From Swiss-Prot:
GO terms for molecular function: glycine binding; glycine dehydrogenase (decarboxylating) activity; pyridoxal phosphate binding. Keywords: Oxidoreductase, Pyridoxal phosphate. GO terms for biological process: glycine decarboxylation via glycine cleavage system. The glycine cleavage system is composed of four proteins: P, T, L and H. The modification N6-(pyridoxal phosphate)lysine is found at residue 708. The glycine cleavage system catalyzes the degradation of glycine. The P protein binds the alpha-amino group of glycine through its pyridoxal phosphate cofactor; CO(2) is released and the remaining methylamine moiety is then transferred to the lipoamide cofactor of the H protein. Its cofactor is pyridoxal 5'-phosphate. Belongs to the GcvP family. PANTHER family: GLYCINE DEHYDROGENASE (DECARBOXYLATING), GLYCINE DEHYDROGENASE, DECARBOXYLATING. One of its GO terms (cellular component) is glycine cleavage complex. This is Glycine dehydrogenase (decarboxylating). It comes from Shigella flexneri.
């Protein structure tokens, strides 16, 4: 039969590229699970009362090429002015070797958070380097492996200051008036829910205020002034006040380390170490503290440990501080941070080394000195005598200056009374400085760069002598070796080879949705039209961004069944926090601010109780029944007991047990009956899109993990994006921003992220995914995700019982394999199985969540039947190995499972095990071998002997 032109055009071609199993494979799997079609399967599994009659209308699919052309036309509406706005964001020069070999490399961007250290040694080493950069520049003892952005790092510093403060009755936090406005905005938001009073005043007046537990100072103020706070910090320390300092990472190359001046906590943005502005993100924040406060620090910390053979190995240390273990008692609700961006900054420091970084920092400062000298020579006054890269220039005709700047396609900072701000950066040239002279002085200024350079080179007083760094930085060999591109390329490749990412194998982590991050989706993030915009540029310069964001928001509204979407939260945890704040402020608007009880099922993600605590709520746990579902009787009892104090419930759907609960609408009705709101966690949205929706189910607010359902890659532990969808009554209460007016905001709420649209430059990834899939493809993706999970469950259930199922023994998009009976019978644990899977070339499923002693498997729709069968065969082979242990063929203390994973060096070492080398490293069915570089890590050793900076280079060899 002759095909039509429409068929030949094949606008839905990408759907077949994204979805792993082809039509024939899907039918084979449907036969295996006993279903006639995808529609029949989802019709059986998803409760009838929540199934959508028609898919959301998000348009027809488009080919990769058509979608890229469409988005390119949108991006071209952005105007790329040269921005000297500063305020924590500057233009950068990302070394091409890092751009090509990391940012554009799926071996780096498709990896997951390094919970399995044996398959993560490469990015753990890069993160350890990031921590070393932080330690050297801040002068402190302990560093984290990144936070979400500078403003949220400030909020975390405030929370940490309260945790460690010896002034238990003090409840006030002092913020110096020269911090960036977006930092103050986020600090105020967090302080409100913690019940802290924020005082904003000149730093020198801090001692006038009583009952202060912590102080936030900014080393280089928002308008550019360098402050020597040594004496003030000393006085504050004598009063037992915890001192936090916000610092500029490039300025720290030249300036005294705040830690040496006595600061307890130092943080800032690592953006200007090679990460494009991207209209606000994503960017990594650095965070450091004194050793005595290490167990109160937020976020990931990479530590040096030992493996089973005694070799040096890296791991995430002190995880007992974190939300997935401590829940509402966690130091922070942070789950994903900004690993990919921290690693870009880390490798930027490796590539340039201390000499290169000093050259860059000195060049920026020299050009700033030249600009200052020329302006002063012509009679203009600078507001500050001491500066690094930012001048605050007093101008009589400010309107005229700004008009000339606009004509020259230049952005100056314009919100300073009777002055303009000018921040230079590593991209600034002498030609740029001459152009700035013309903008500020007119074309006939008569100034020459070389003449001015001679003057300032001999007599620069713009940095106080006491503020000049007098110690060496980045002395570790890793920062002094890889300065040729050949060496750098090979170093990065050596790190990449140590890790297991989606470019090598399926990552079947339950609740993580490790699906394809298609090349076409990733291409736009490096377009200069998206990468080079300052987040605070005039809105008319960002019309392309505004169109793309509005279109994406409209699609998400339709897919979720909500009325509005807020794009600001830059992680799932941040989205939870923002959604709960919207609920809190909604209740307050109705004079029901006393509603502060949050009901959370026992099966919930650890971020849920941690976020509820951050939002100032009390957590009350709701029991689950023997089938893993929310116990309705207990829910009613807890809701009734809470009464007028009920704020909300946080529920995940499908449940974290991998089941579509039949009573989800009844759950919503019970909570609404008692005046509460329903927060539906979007972690499992990949099993809803096109089939049902949170709004249709009856929820009021959800966050969406764009880094799960909508294809933003996990980046080895970030970036993420967690926008929130809300019903109309909550729309006035989503986050706002103090610097940028967000279109459609009805009331002014506090910000939760530094930038108005969070990590805006990765939103094109989700835009591309939805545009290429269309309504038809999105629904099919959800259906195939469900099919793949049920196929795995059906083939493995005899070897590993599936713990929870819904009607007809079905699961949703993931399944929980119960290892507890096997462990009781044989002594082999879920940990042993997880590590043995590495020998078979797989990342382990999620261990012991949401139920201890289990493995949770989520294959996603992107994995083909071939890959699913490879995983299933590996699991069945492991089960056969367990049977060998059970039968006594191999002793419990010496077998391939408890000794896993096995590394190459074992092949040439003496072999005394009761199983062969071949069984160890080439078990059944393994052909394309992934080699871990370390054996199983000693977690206890790592936490007892905490060491979080670079080890001697010999340890890596």
């Amino acid at each position: 039969m002759t095909q039509t032109l429409s068929q030949l055009e094949n606008s839905g071609a990408f759907i077949e590229r994204h979805i792993g199993p082809d039509a024939a494979q899907q039918q084979e799997m449907l036969n295996a699970v006993g279903a006639q079609s995808l529609n029949a399967l989802t019709g059986q599994i998803v409760p009838k009362d929540i199934q959508l009659a028609t898919p959301p209308q998000v348009g027809a699919p488009a080919t990769e090429y058509a979608a890229l052309a469409e988005l390119k036309a949108i991006a071209s509406r952005n105007k790329r002015f040269t921005s000297y706005i500063g305020m924590g964001y500057t233009a950068v020069q990302l070394p091409p070797v890092i751009l090509r070999n990391m940012l554009e490399n799926p071996g780096w961007y498709t990896a997951y958070t390094p919970y399995q250290p044996e398959v993560s040694q490469g990015r753990l080493e890069a993160l350890l380097n990031f921590q070393q950069v932080t330690l050297d520049l801040t002068g402190l003892d302990m560093a984290s492996a990144s936070l979400l952005d500078e403003a949220t790092a400030a909020a975390e510093a405030m929370a940490m200051a309260k945790r460690v403060s010896k002034l238990k009755n003090a409840n006030r936090f002092f913020v110096a008036s020269n911090v960036h406005p977006q930092t103050l905005d986020v600090v105020r938001t967090r302080a409100e829910t913690f019940g802290f009073e924020v005082i904003v005043d000149d730093a020198q007046k801090v001692l006038d205020h009583q009952d202060v537990f912590g102080v936030l100072l900014q080393q280089v103020g928002t308008t550019g002034e360098i402050h020597d706070y040594t004496a003030l910090i000393s006085e504050l320390k004598s009063r037992k006040i915890v001192v936090s300092v916000a610092a500029d990472i490039m300025a720290l190359v030249l300036l005294t380390a705040p830690g040496k001046q006595g600061a307890d906590i130092v943080f800032g943005s690592a953006q200007r170490f090679g990460v494009p502005m991207g209209y606000g993100g994503p960017h990594a924040a650095f965070f450091a503290a004194k050793d005595e406060y290490k167990r109160s620090m937020p976020g990931r910390i990479i530590g040096v440990s030992k493996d089973a053979a005694g070799n040096t190995a890296l791991r995430m240390a002190m995880q007992t501080r974190e939300q997935h273990i401590r829940r509402e008692k966690a130091n922070s609700n942070i789950c994903t941070s900004q690993v990919l961006l921290a690693n870009i900054a880390s490798l930027y420091a490796v590539y340039h080394g201390p000499v290169g970084l000093k050259r860059i920092a000195n060049r920026i400062h020299r050009l700033t000195d030249i600009l200052a000298a020329g302006l002063q020579q012509k009679g203009l006054k600078l507001r500050h005598a001491h500066y690094f890269d930012t001048l605050c220039v007093e101008v009589a005709d400010k309107a005229g200056v700004l008009t000339r700047a606009e004509a020259a396609e230049i952005n100056l900072r314009s919100d300073i009374l009777n002055a303009v701000g000018i921040t230079l950066d590593e991209t600034t040239t002498r030609e740029n400085v001459m152009q700035l002279f013309s903008v500020l002085l007119g074309d006939n200024h008569g100034l020459e760069i070389d003449t001015l350079d001679k003057d300032v080179a001999h007599d620069s007083r713009s940095i106080q002598p006491a503020m000049l760094r007098d110690d060496e930085i980045l002395t570790h060999p890793v920062f002094n070796r890889y300065h040729s591109e050949t060496e750098m390329m090979r170093y990065m490749h050596s790190l990449e080879r140590k890790d297991l990412a989606l470019n090598q194998a399926m990552i079947p982590l339950g609740s993580c949705t490790m699906k394809l991050n298609a090349a076409a989706e990733m291409i736009p993030i490096t377009w200069t039209e998206f990468a080079e915009l300052h987040p605070f540029c005039p809105p008319e310069q960002a019309e392309g961004y505004q169109q793309m964001i509005a279109q994406l928001a409209d699609w998400l509204v339709k897919l979720t069944g909500y009325d509005a979407v807020c794009m600001q939260p830059n992680s799932g945890a941040q989205g939870e926090y923002a959604g709960l704040l919207a609920i809190r402020h909604y209740h307050e608007s109705r004079n029901e601010g006393h509603r502060d009880i949050c009901l959370i099922p026992a099966s919930a993600h650890g971020t849920n109780p941690a976020s509820a605590h951050m939002a100032g709520m009390q957590v009350v746990v709701v029991a689950c029944d023997k089938n893993g579902n929310i116990d309705l009787t207990d829910l009613r009892a807890k809701a009734e007991q809470a009464g007028d104090n009920l704020s909300c419930i946080m529920v995940t759907y499908p449940s974290t047990h991998g089941v579509y609960e039949e009573t989800i609408r009844e759950v919503c009705e019970v909570v609404h009956q008692f005046g509460g709101q329903v927060y539906l966690d979007g972690a499992n949205m990949n099993a809803q899109v096109g089939i049902t929706s949170p709004g249709f189910i009856g929820a009021d607010v959800s966050h969406l993990n764009l880094h799960k359902t909508f294809c933003i890659p996990h980046g080895g532990g970030g970036p993420g994006m967690g926008p929130i969808g809300v019903k109309a009554h909550l729309a006035p209460f989503v986050p706002g921003h103090s610097v940028v007016q967000i279109e459609g905001m009805l009331t002014r709420q506090g910000a939760v992220s530094a930038a108005p649209f969070g990590s805006a430059s990765i939103l094109p990834i989700s835009w591309m995914y939805i545009r290429m899939m269309g309504a038809e493809g999105l629904k099919k993706a959800s259906q195939v995700a469900i099919l793949n999970a049920n196929y795995i469950a059906s083939r493995l259930q005899d070897a590993f019982p599936v713990l929870y199922t819904g009607r007809d023994g079905r699961v949703a998009h993931e399944c929980i394999l119960d290892i507890r009976p096997l462990k009781e019978e044989t002594g082999i644990s879920e940990l042993d199985i997880a590590k043995r899977l590495i020998d078979y070339g797989f990342h382990a499923p999620t261990m012991s969540f949401p139920v201890a002693g289990t493995l949770m498997v989520e294959p996603t729709e992107s994995e083909s039947k071939v890959e699913l069968d490879r995983f299933i065969d590996a699991m069945l082979a492991i089960r056969a190995e367990i049977d060998q242990v059970k039968a006594g063929v191999w002793p419990l203390e010496d077998n391939p499972l408890v000794n896993a994973p096995h590394i190459q060096s074992e092949l040439v070492a003496e072999w005394a095990h009761p199983y062969s080398r071949e069984v160890a490293v080439f078990p059944a069915g393994v052909a394309d071998k992934y080699w871990p570089t370390v054996k199983r890590l000693d977690d206890v050793y790592g936490d007892r002997n905490l060491f979080c900076s670079c080890v001697p280079i010999s340890e890596y060899q």
